[in-house]
Every structure is written in structure tokens, then in C-alpha cells.
């Protein structure tokens, strides 16, 4: 599982399910039959696309949290459960992603104001990450245009 998560990552997300399935098969059948599931998994993992971009992104995000410490949650993301919270601006201008065109509120950020916007995940040109990069590049361009249209 560690090899799958760190070394293959989102280049081939199916590999994680396959690793869990091989483990489950071995647990159910034992040796020697269950070993065949691991053998097939090893062959698959050895021959599939590799990427540690997700792993690197996770580590960078953790490093930023360690460095910056606890930051304030942006007001628009705070739950306005009481009248006082509403008066303080909690939840103001919050955009529900599910209601936005395309399912993503493009001009909304989830980062604390003190941190500013960050990009952690930079997909590599291998496996499924090729498509993920195309999608993220498109979303980032659309986000920039949406923010420019609102003067942000």
C-alpha cells in the first residue's frame, strides 16, 4: 500500500483498490492461492505509470501548516449558526459549489487570508495525471477570469 500511495499516486488511482483487493484475497484464501493475487499486483504496479506529485503536495501542505501555525478560517467559510455570527459576517458571500456552474465556485478560496492562495498539486505528464493537469489548467484559467471579472 505504501508503494502504491507514494510512488504511483494519481497516475493510476486504480492501483490502490487493486492493492487492497490483493490483500483481501490473501486474507481470505491464504497461502499459496492468495500469493497469486500479490504476484499479479506486483506485476501491475511495476508496469504502471508512476507519480509522487500527490505525495509531494501533501508534504508541502503539511510543511506550510507547521510553518504558519493555526490561521483564521476565512469568514465566508464559517458557519453562521447564530444571529451574532451572521452579524460578524460568518458565511457572508459563501458560494455553494454544488450550485455553481460546473460544480466549482471559481472565484472562492478556501485558504486563510494570511496564507494567500497556494498551489500544492502539480500533476506529472504520466498516466491519469495527464488528464488531471489538463483539467486543473482549465480550472485555474477559468478561476483567474472569474476573479478578474469581479475585480479580485
Describe the residue ranges of each PLM region.
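Hydrophobic "lid/gating" helix adjacent to the active-site nucleophile
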Residues: 5-8
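Conserved catalytic/coupling modules of large nucleotide/cofactor-utilizing molecular machines
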Residues: 17-152
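Short, well-ordered alpha-helical segments
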Residues: 12-16
Amino acid at each position: 500500500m505504501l508503494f502504491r500511495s507514494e510512488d504511483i499516486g494519481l497516475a493510476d488511482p486504480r492501483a490502490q483498490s487493486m492493492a487492497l483487493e490483493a490483500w483481501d484475497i490473501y486474507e481470505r484464501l491464504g497461502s499459496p492461492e492468495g500469493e497469486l493475487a500479490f504476484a499479479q499486483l506486483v506485476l501491475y504496479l511495476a508496469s504502471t505509470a508512476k507519480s509522487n506529485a500527490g505525495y509531494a503536495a501533501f508534504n508541502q501542505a503539511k510543511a506550510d501548516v507547521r510553518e504558519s501555525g493555526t490561521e483564521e478560517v476565512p469568514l465566508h467559510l464559517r458557519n453562521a449558526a447564530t444571529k451574532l455570527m451572521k452579524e460578524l459576517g460568518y458565511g457572508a458571500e459563501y458560494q455553494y459549489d454544488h450550485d455553481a456552474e460546473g460544480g466549482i465556485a471559481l472565484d472562492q478560496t478556501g485558504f486563510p487570508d494570511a496564507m494567500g492562495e497556494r498551489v500544492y498539486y502539480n500533476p506529472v505528464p504520466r498516466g491519469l495525471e495527464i488528464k488531471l493537469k489538463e483539467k486543473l489548467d482549465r480550472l485555474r484559467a477559468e478561476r483567474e477570469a472569474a476573479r478578474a471579472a469581479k475585480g479580485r
